[in-house]
Amino acid sequence: MNEQIGKSIEELRAYNKSLERSPEYQRILPEVMWEVNTQFVKEIIAQEERWLSYKVEEEPIEDDDPIIVEFFKTLRADLKAQDELRKKRIEEAKELLPTDPARAAELLSKLGSCHTLWALQKRILKEKYGITWYTPAELNPDVKFD
């Protein structure tokens, strides 16, 4: 059974390699990646803006333990600082998006983003071009990607 799965994966790898070398794929790839990166950036910006819509609690911290009070004050300050960095990254990405979506996507990428980008690429290739493409994660089930 495992040998059969291994053979199937090897066949899919060969298919992908052949596809990725084809002139047609090479011709459409820049357009596909432009769309992939644009959609990725728009999705991440929407997520980040939703996050920013939440406010850090400003009520006084009531506790008899000064260590706990200091911890929560520090936590609030850290959250506010992270929000400022988040706002700056969003603005930079919005500026880059019309002319360089790849750089905007790179700016907003984080651990695990490769899976989102691959899913978008797979969907766009299938829906727009009728091309079945397999992600590196699908072709390498024993490898952890991030």
What are these regions (language model features)?
Residues N2-L12:
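Short amphipathic alpha-helical heptad-repeat segments
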Residues V36-E91, P98-K128, T132-T135:
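Acidic, low-complexity, intrinsically disordered interaction modules
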Residues K144-D146:
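Short acidic DE-rich linear segments
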Residues E10, A14-K17, W34, T38:
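Extended, non-membrane alpha-helical segments enriched in charged/polar residues
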Residues S18-L29, L97-T99:
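Charged, low-complexity interaction regions
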